[in-house]
């Protein structure tokens, strides 16, 4: 039977519940247990797909095409279990499901209330999510409850967790509470009162945490841990210090060294083998002792909030681990390029344009792409970054001066990039879209496989075919492909059913490394293996740096 660990947060948000939950999962997996994770989000949106990156950060796409919280990306990077749609749900989905049942008459005329109907539905979603785990029936399901204890929107989720713990019985569920222990510089000491009050809030609703994870900018002294233990009624050895680290991949070892996994296993009456965190130690060793160093410029419009590119940043870090190369990322606002030109790019070893939406900043990205192509600087374009690379090539090489995307200019006569109106999803069902379709949940989403053209750089990187995740509603227009290919551009991968261009590149006779992909390879990169596309990109950046150094 699956046992549950509920992870809650207190005092403030953004303390790192997702990293803590993923790190615990990684330790338990290293002990031979089958583990899955779920994220419960208390907002009323059905999913984060239409939320601003400035408010929510990255939208992580699962294999089965769900638009989910970025914490699911952390989960997949830390454990081997793949996430699915059932691993993330929101208040919006819960209420939508309950209202549908009420309309069907499932409640037989009863008054539908938060308790028991909403809380029962939350419990059903949790158990369904655990049961759908790709690892088979999990030994442990770690459930991260979003928001902060005390927030009104989190109360139904906390109440559902309390009821579920009671229903499952002793040794079947436990609670881990992550809280802040701030350092007050003027007083010169850590303050435990916010943690005490946060635990008090939990106890008011009937939840007694078994473990406290105390976030601070430094290790918490024993005297402070004893004080927290006494006032929160949590054993002293279960008051665990989680201090700031320069890499999230150090957190599993930090938690294991303080016995978190032992406490959880004892509470759940599990007796797995000892933890083997040698892989994490090796990763940290590689991270701290690179042999080379490169600087890659990421040109986008969300550069002031790097959470918008979380998986992409981590994918570059994974590539750095597997190429022994420290990757410095410079975030460059594409609107600044529009105003000031490309001088800010000239010291870079490579240029990357990530995915995005909307017209704002696109001409700056196109200018950056033009610079990378003409200066022979390695270039990687992802999703929108590929579409803009095709537009730049069409304008400046092929001579289609009005080339554009209908996303930015619906009336352009040279629709090099246009809305996809029909395609097959990963189950083989036909999806259709028009300009008037809803924005939410209407993109081409999820993992799709396509063959690669022999003799291309794409084949060198991936092999015979590619299976990556998508999140887009616009695509390179096949009508213009013959003109693009006549100019030298190579479409190196296409979908087998709809013949949609999935990858483009320039031949080495035109450029040493210039690749665009319509999919999002960052979603499948892990620290264990890295990703072949990002490894090749970092190697190209290093080769460019060394060539420029030799010329100098």
Swiss-Prot record:
The keyword Zinc-finger does not apply. Residues 1-270 are annotated as: Amidoligase domain. Keywords: ATP-binding, Glutamine amidotransferase, Ligase, Magnesium, Metal-binding, Nucleotide-binding, Pyrimidine biosynthesis. CTP binds at residues 13, 151-153, 191-196, 227. UTP binds at residues 13, 191-196, 227. Its EC number is 6.3.4.2. Pathway: Pyrimidine metabolism; CTP biosynthesis via de novo pathway; CTP from UDP: step 2/2. InterPro entries: Class_I_gatase-like (IPR029062), CTP_synthase (IPR004468), CTP_synthase_N (IPR017456), GATASE (IPR017926), GATase1_CTP_Synthase (IPR033828), P-loop_NTPase (IPR027417). The active site is at 383 (nucleophile), 520, 522. CDD domains: CTPS_N (cd03113), GATase1_CTP_Synthase (cd01746). Allosterically activated by GTP, when glutamine is the substrate; GTP has no effect on the reaction when ammonia is the substrate. The allosteric effector GTP functions by stabilizing the protein conformation that binds the tetrahedral intermediate(s) formed during glutamine hydrolysis. Inhibited by the product CTP, via allosteric rather than competitive inhibition. It catalyses: UTP + L-glutamine + ATP + H2O = CTP + L-glutamate + ADP + phosphate + 2 H(+); L-glutamine + H2O = L-glutamate + NH4(+); UTP + NH4(+) + ATP = CTP + ADP + phosphate + 2 H(+). GO terms for molecular function: ATP binding; CTP synthase activity; glutaminase activity; identical protein binding; metal ion binding. One of its GO terms (cellular component) is cytosol. It is an enzyme of class 6 (ligase). Catalyzes the ATP-dependent amination of UTP to CTP with either L-glutamine or ammonia as the source of nitrogen. Regulates intracellular CTP levels through interactions with the four ribonucleotide triphosphates. CTPSs have evolved a hybrid strategy for distinguishing between UTP and CTP. The overlapping regions of the product feedback inhibitory and substrate sites recognize a common feature in both compounds, the triphosphate moiety. To differentiate isosteric substrate and product pyrimidine rings, an additional pocket far from the expected kinase/ligase catalytic site, specifically recognizes the cytosine and ribose portions of the product inhibitor. Homotetramer. This is CTP synthase.
